[in-house]
A protein has these predicted regions:
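General beta-strand structural signal in soluble alpha/beta enzymes
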Residues: 11, 49-53, 99-103
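Solvent-exposed alpha-helices and their adjacent loops that cap or buttress functional pockets
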Residues: 1-5, 40-44, 49-50, 94, ...
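Ligand-binding beta-strand-loop-alpha-helix segment within the catalytic cores
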Residues: 63-129
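N-terminal glycine-/serine-/threonine-rich phosphate-binding loop
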Residues: 1-47
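N-terminal active-site beta-alpha-beta segment that forms phosphate/nucleotide-binding
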Residues: 32, 40-41, 47-48, 54-61, ...
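Short, active-site-adjacent cap segments at secondary-structure transitions
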Residues: 17-19, 55-60, 108-109
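Extended interaction regions within the primary functional domain
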Residues: 33-34, 50, 107, 122
Length: 129
């Protein structure tokens, strides 16, 4: 049996990783492939936390070009990250991987509030956060 160098990892995924090559939006094939790879890591006994971007859905420079208030553009990006997290959550759970989506923006019906200790607890229970 191999010895793991890390027992807990944080994976940073750009939003574009959920898009088909050269595209935008969320591609089901890409989401399933990423979920399969994450499942393989979990099966090694590694705790996994994921931070996902939203570049496939929203780019801040578009907001700048529109003359949008920076805070509004930032909020749009944060909403995009939750959308991507929900898509990845669904792909993971279809493969039998328990997950929790957490966010610092309050939206109780779709994601838990991010609390560091709660995130650690979820990972200790075998969930991908």
């Amino acid at each position: 049996m191999q010895t793991l160098k890390y027992h807990r990892i944080m994976l940073k995924l750009g939003g574009e990783s959920l898009s088909a090559a050269g595209g935008s939006g969320i591609d089901a094939v890409q989401a399933k492939d990423i979920a399969r790879r994450i499942k393989e890591v979990r099966e090694l006994g590694v705790d996994v936390a994921i931070v996902i971007g939203a570049g496939n859905l929203w780019r801040g420079r578009v907001g700048q070009e529109m003359g949008m208030d920076q805070a509004t553009a930032d909020y749009m990006g944060m909403l995009g990250t939750v959308m991507n997290a929900l898509a990845l959550m669904d792909a993971l759970e279809h493969q039998g991987v328990m997950t929790r989506v957490m966010t610092s923006i309050e939206m109780k019906t779709v994601a838990e509030p991010y609390i560091w200790r709660r995130a650690i607890h979820h990972m200790e229970k075998g969930r991908v956060v």
